[in-house]
Amino acid sequence: MTDLHTDVERYLRYLSVERQLSPITLLNYQRQLEAIINFASENGLQSWQQCDVTMVRNFAVRSRRKGLGAASLALRLSALRSFFDWLVSQNELKANPAKGVSAPKAPRHLPKNIDVDDMNRLLDIDINDPLAVRDRAMLEVMYGAGLRLSELVGLDIKHLDLESGEVWVMGKGSKERRLPIGRNAVAWIEHWLDLRDLFGSEDDALFLSKLGKRISARNVQKRFAEWGIKQGLNNHVHPHKLRHSFATHMLESSGDLRGVQELLGHANLSTTQIYTHLDFQHLASVYDAAHPRAKRGK
């Protein structure tokens, strides 16, 4: 193992132990940093002390030429900057060579959501098969509380307060949130808990795979996509789309941006504000369809 690999392994241990980042986030860091290790090795670097701003810029250009999108490149450079900042804090680098290198701005795409009618159709799973009950409970919790995928799979039974209809989740940066989940989610969690012991697990996880282990993020993605097809939805159903739908529907009903920010666990209001654009699109379509002066130029 080269010094390049050794330093990255040390950094990943730091993120896991000191920062307590989720396994999914750690895997993302690992993938991004493996790309720079490969590039550095190809260019004859033996240690990170040999890396300079020119090499980082060349790495960014190479990534773009290989088809990496602007948003993905920004993520890769962010991981690299964080890694170099850590090396500086360990007195192994004098300065961060990635500090002044930025990716081109990515066009901001509005997140797609599932409308209320399609959401009701998706949630209309009335099968008494244990795995179907588990899936219905996961869908209800994710849409009912606007959880991230990592937050959903990280739920333990001890995080539930079904009497008050609340759940505790550990979000980004180890920030805990206490969230209402709604009576439908409570009812389906209770139904799932009645069947959960069939899997004979001693795991504390709320949601289990058919092998009795904590369900994986990939398994959740696969099951949600399958239910989208079974329930006749035209659009691909993935977990983050349920979170988008929660945010959009909450804003359409309440208009309370700050409240939705708290529920989603966004550190910055600007992250939540993207959903106001979605809400405006909805209002604009209503206006165009209903207002007598809307049909301009016709």
From Swiss-Prot:
Assigned GO CC terms: cytoplasm; Holliday junction resolvase complex
Active site: 148, 172, 240, 243, 266, 275 (o-(3'-phospho-dna)-tyrosine intermediate)
Subcellular location field: Cytoplasm
One GO process term, biological-process aspect: plasmid maintenance
Gene3D superfamilies noted in UniProt: 1.10.150.130, Intergrase catalytic core
Regulation (activators, inhibitors): During recombination, the heterotetrameric complex catalyzes two consecutive pairs of strand exchanges, implying that specific pairs of active sites are sequentially switched on and off in the recombinase tetramer to ensure that appropriate DNA strands will be exchanged at both reaction steps. FtsK plays a central role in this catalytic state switch that turns recombinase on and off reciprocally. The reciprocal C-terminal interaction between XerC and XerD may also participate in the enzymatic switch process.
Sequence ranges assigned to domain Tyr recombinase in this UniProt record: 109-288
UniProt-listed PROSITE patterns: CB (PS51900), TYR_RECOMBINASE (PS51898)
GO MF assignments: DNA binding; site-specific recombinase activity; tyrosine-based site-specific recombinase activity
Keywords in alphabetical order: Cell cycle, Cell division, Chromosome partition, Cytoplasm, DNA integration, DNA recombination, DNA-binding
UniProt domain Core-binding (CB): residue ranges: 2-88
Xref: InterPro entries: CB, DNA_brk_join_enz, Integrase-like_cat_sf, Integrase_catalytic, Integrase_recombinase_N, Integrase_SAM-like_N, Recomb_XerC, Tyrosine_recombinase_XerC/XerD
NCBIfam families the record matches: PRK00283.1, recomb_XerC
Quaternary state and interactors: Forms a cyclic heterotetrameric complex composed of two molecules of XerC and two molecules of XerD, in which XerC interacts with XerD via its C-terminal region, XerD interacts with XerC via its C-terminal region and so on.
Family membership noted in the UniProt record: Belongs to the 'phage' integrase family. XerC subfamily.
Purpose of the protein: Site-specific tyrosine recombinase, which acts by catalyzing the cutting and rejoining of the recombining DNA molecules. Binds cooperatively to specific DNA consensus sequences that are separated from XerD binding sites by a short central region, forming the heterotetrameric XerC-XerD complex that recombines DNA substrates. The complex is essential to convert dimers of the bacterial chromosome into monomers to permit their segregation at cell division. It also contributes to the segregational stability of plasmids at ColE1 xer (or cer) and pSC101 (or psi) sites.
Name of the protein in its database record: Tyrosine recombinase XerC
Gene name tied to this protein: xerC
